[in-house]
């Protein structure tokens, strides 16, 4: 699998929250049918709460909200970012 880094951003917000977004363009395969591999992380360093979105094989697209794991239906990069921001606001009370 040839992966081309499409986007990477990591930041510390208010000396408390870590946000990291990594998106790779990959060949369309059975493992990555959308041609994208991603990892989105938002973590509260003070309380240990976290929101994670990724699509590693064999699980495919899914979301971690603290210790809970949920399936996720990937539609597009824009929708992925929109959903990530909504999850952060809903579960952490932080607007990016």
Please describe what each predicted stretch is.
Residues 1-62:
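The feature represents the first ordered module of a protein
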Residues 59-72:
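Short helix/strand-capping connector loops at secondary-structure junctions
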Residues 69-96:
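Short, compact, well-ordered microdomains
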């Amino acid at each position: 699998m040839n992966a081309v880094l499409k986007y990477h951003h990591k930041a510390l917000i208010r000396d408390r929250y870590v946000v990291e977004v990594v998106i790779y363009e990959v060949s369309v395969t059975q493992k990555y049918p959308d041609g994208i591999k991603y990892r989105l992380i938002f973590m509260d360093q003070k309380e240990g709460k976290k929101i994670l979105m990724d699509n590693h094989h064999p699980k495919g697209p899914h979301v971690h909200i603290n210790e809970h794991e949920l399936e996720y239906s990937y539609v597009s990069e824009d929708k992925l970012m929109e959903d990530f921001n909504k999850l952060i606001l809903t579960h952490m009370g932080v607007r990016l």
